[in-house]
């Protein structure tokens, strides 16, 4: 085979051709009508080949130049056909490679030093890099060495021995059978009887590569292709009979050249093409899955699904490609297609005898069929392998069908098929019947064929759904009219639709035949099917038929019986809520990897009796002779999803729904008669038909009182965790819209390590303890008795101490001071009094507020003014805000009203003029308004700062200093409001001077690491430091007395329980009797740097508990008290303004419990 090579110029056309020998044999064992004609191509291209005999050269010239049929050589028309065939490759992914291969072979004919090895019969030099070679069988590139001076063919031969061993066997056989002058031809093995045999075939790429040396140049190929195609276009008006006669004559001129016959589904006629001989080299694209995929025209390592047109990778590199991803995609996304094609047969369909072609068929643009004459894609007429469907066309589609006879119904397909018009599609060439005649068909017919096959492969789920008219990515259920998304653009499927059927309409699924039968056992999807079925057996009862053993494939994640006891948390999908105790349990950290192990452990630990009931029911369901409805089997033995049986009262789902309804009554302060409302009952009947709603008396006598007792016990357990054993309070008198007055008491404490709230970074805790109605003519004694009663029930009875009580009512504060209870005034209430006095002190400011108030009221009442204001806001690009109407008794609302008017100044002026308002704001008034806002802004910020949840008493003194300095600065920054500023200064001095010298505020400020002694003078700092040391000594003495009373005497000797004399008593023990003195702790604390204002002081003292335990306890006593009652007032502001506490709606004896639940349920995170 390495002998000689012949260079044979071709007359005038300069066509260089090697010897091409075609030897065809027919398989006599096959039926004459279905005989498979086979062709063997053998080509040899050696650089230094000696000249053959003159007769042989003459024959080659006659075959290549004169184009006359001669024996075993190719005819001219056949050569033109091959030119047209090869022209298809020039515009595809492989066209560049093929042209480069041709040029490389033609240009390197006279180079004899590098291609003497037998490896060059299977490789050619890469046109991009001369140190690399490309395999002619698999088109993979291999390196021959690092530099051009040291090149070898060891890697090349190794690749041939490993990847293509049969090529070497064929080569050796041909050497023994023939001579060097007469190239031998390989005899094709007989066609096996089993069509599904996995015998290997010769790839079309090899065909192209073996014939590449016969290609003169890409330009000549294109010219010949144009000639052939143009002649076909011009003769389009010729009758079909004449076309057949011409083809038969051409076939008769070269009887030894056999052709493949393919089934034409659109015209039931055949097209001729060259047959590819079988090989034993082992093609990688022979799997049955290639009926549903074709190779991507842009990347040969990827495949495109013909159903959803999605692209999938077959491997990371070109050396390790497979079909596992393709099989997995078909099983997950198009399972119904797989089951449909395997459901009626005893095995998988026969595999392809040939791999799919690597090149796509290029469809011409619509309406311009002639434009394809210059495109290699026109070759689509020659081979049905260019069809967009990889599956063998069914016999029922082989009737005479013309492109114009395609019905409009064929166009309305799955929405995924709408994207096929733009895609270049390739099928897997399958063996077709050989007794049919194959005329050339138009590209439009191919596209219509594709649509017909696509519709036949349409998923069965579309019998139950229809595409949404407004959005093609969604489908509408035919039973419940629900709109379900099919995925994102470019990645649509039917998984969500199947899941909807299994969850909402299992009875429809039950009426269908088994989707997974025994016929799927031998298919590529058997592994996936068996794995999925085995994973479902533990959670889903098997639905077994007489003749089929399998389960319904379901994608639902809630098939486990555990979901009868849990529901997915609405706030976080990775967590679930137990229907028995209401606890939140995590299912995993990653949303893509969630499980039910934690759910099972929770039931085993806290609700073991529930699992026992499930086991007994499961045993009953598995008893012979008992058949359960399909819906109950699919959703678990304890599920009542599709059953008409009502829940019993102790059922976990019924108990959870009843508890949620009771929560709704408490949180929204709804009357108990809500459960009798028709609309509410209809809603529950639709959401959960198996649930029976209890009567109103059940909620008023059982549900709400029981919930109140549970929440009260939880609040008590929280109070026991208070640090330093001190609880602070806020108390006040709250008036409802019914002119009823209520006394409230709210507790505030600090918790560092809570067993109820683990991993909680917020150390500030609060809870509403009680609410009680009082008479309008209440006295201080009655309030004191009520508070003493509450403190005894909530605080002193569990060993806690009563701390500081913050109130905005002067009478309550006076009463507490007389009763030896520590109390302070609400800072926010004091600021309100100061600002209100300052506003009333200057008449001009009052007149300005009156004008602004009337102007805003007119705009709110006039639709014309509102529309004009909106137009001017758009014209002047102002914020689209409405004007604010203030409440005269609340200065903060007046401040926000003035700020909004200044923001909309330009629009407000024009609206006032165009709408003829009597209230017009002058330029001087606008300036005064800005000055008033400038003064009120720091006081508004101070009120909001001190009303925050984490604010403490330590912030009061720093805030007073800040406001005093700001007022001094405002005298030079404002105009026209000096009287107001003087009133502010005097009111602050009279109302806040006592606070600056209050030891409780001073200690709180010193113990706050953000301030310490930075706000005091040196004399004051030294005095307050000594006071703090004495306070700490008093606290230590109290704690030592408590420790001695508990029996923890440090001086008592240690005694061994085992013997009277302990050996350890002989060891010398040295104890450090020197403990940290209060003075040392205080000095060490004050010497540290001051922290930033954003830091939490309680977090700081939590870290210092081990270093300074006594000082940390003292700090918690003062820093745990809030400076304002506003946080407590916010809990009652909404119902008071809504005016929903009418006597007909709520019974007064129940109102106290409802308001208690309304406030505390969110505070304990509904864990009761």
Curated annotation (Swiss-Prot):
Keywords: Activator, Cytoplasm, DNA-binding, Isopeptide bond, Metal-binding, Nucleus, Phosphoprotein, Repeat, RNA-binding, Transcription, Transcription regulation, Ubl conjugation, Zinc, Zinc-finger. It comes from the Eukaryota. It is found in: Cytoplasm; Nucleus; Photoreceptor inner segment. Residues 370-390, 1040-1049 have a biased composition (Polar residues). Zn(2+) 4 binds at residues 578, 581, 602, 607. A zinc finger (BED-type) spans 114-171, 284-341, 456-512, 557-614. Expressed in the thymus. In the retina, expressed in the cone photoreceptors. Residues 22-55, 362-443, 1040-1059 are annotated as: Disordered. Zn(2+) 2 binds at residues 305, 308, 329, 334. The modification Phosphoserine is found at residue 623. The keyword Glycosyltransferase does not apply. Residues 1083-1168 are annotated as: Required for homodimerization and nuclear accumulation. Residues 37-52 have a biased composition (Basic and acidic residues). There is a cross-link at residues 42, 489 (Glycyl lysine isopeptide (Lys-Gly) (interchain with G-Cter in SUMO2)). Zn(2+) 3 binds at residues 477, 480, 500, 505. Zn(2+) 1 binds at residues 135, 138, 159, 164. GO terms for cellular component: cytoplasm; nucleoplasm; nucleus; photoreceptor inner segment. One of its GO terms (molecular function) is transcription cis-regulatory region binding. It holds the Pfam family Dimer_Tnp_hAT. GO terms for biological process: positive regulation of transcription by RNA polymerase II. Homodimer; via C-terminus. Interacts with MYH9. Interacts with SAFB/SAFB1. Transcriptional regulator that binds to poly-guanine tracts in gene promoters and activates transcription. Able to bind single- and double-stranded DNA and RNA. This is Zinc finger BED domain-containing protein 4.
